[in-house]
Amino acid sequence: MIPYPSFDKIAFEIGPFGSFGPLKVHWYGIMYLVAFAAAWFLARLRAKKPGSTWKPVDVDDFLFFRMLGTILGGRLGYVFFYGMSYWALDPWYPFKITDGGMSFHGGLIGVMVALAIFAVRRKRHIADVFDFAAPLPGSGLCAGRIGNFINGELWGKPTDAPWGFMVNGEGRHATQLYEAALEGVVLFLILWWYTAKPRPRMAPAGLFLIVYSLARTTVEFWRLPDSHLNEASGGYLVGHWFTMGMLLSIPMLLIGATLMFMAYRRRENSGNFSAVPA
C-alpha cells in the first residue's frame, strides 16, 4: 500500500500587496493553466501539418472560445448535474467558484456551444471544428485529474491492492490517476495517432466520444459517486453500481458510434485538410 503524501493545495503565495494578499496560487489552478497551454501547443502543431487549412490566428481564436466553453460549461454542468441540492439552499452557489466543482460533461457541452459559435463566425463547417478539437482534450484531462489527486479528492472505493493509497488510515483506489491514464494519456495517444492523417468528416469527433465514454465508464466501477445525489444508496442512482458519470457517458458512446458510422458511410472530405481522407 502506498502512503498518500497529503499535498498542500496551495503551490505558492505572492505578495502581500499593501492591504491585499497574499495571492494564493493553487495547484488545481496551475493544472488548468497547464491544460490550456498544452492545448495551444498541440493545436499549433495540428495547424502546421501539411495540407492543413488552419492558420495560427485561427488557432488563437479557437482556443479562446474553447477556454470560455470549458470554464463556463464545466461550472454550470456541475451545478445542474451534481449540485442542484446545493443551489436550492443557496441561490448564489453557481457563482461560488472558489468552493470548487467542475464537470467534464458540462465542460464538453460548453465547448461544443462555444466552438459552434466560433465555426459560424469563421464560416467553417461545425463538424470540422469539432474534429480539429478532438485530439486536444486528453492532455488537459490528464492535468486536471492530477490536480484532483494533489487536492486529495475524488478517491475511489476501499481496496487492499498494493497499488492502492493509504488515505486517513484506509486503502483507497486512486481513481484520479486511473482517469489521468485512461481519459488523459490513452485518449490523447489514440486520437493523436488517428488524426495524423485526414479522416472522414465527423470521424475524429465520434472516436473521441467513444474512447472517453468507455474510459470514464470503466473507472466509474472503482470511483465513489457523489453521495448527496442519492443518500439512501451512497450516491448510486441504481443499485450499488450505476452512477451519474455512467448516465452521462453512455449517451456519448451511442452518439460517438453513430457519428463514426455516418462518417465512414458518407466519407465526406474534412475541411481541415486539403487532402482526400484515406
Report residues per predicted region:
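A feature for loop-to-transmembrane-helix boundaries and adjacent hydrophobic helices
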Residues: M1-A278
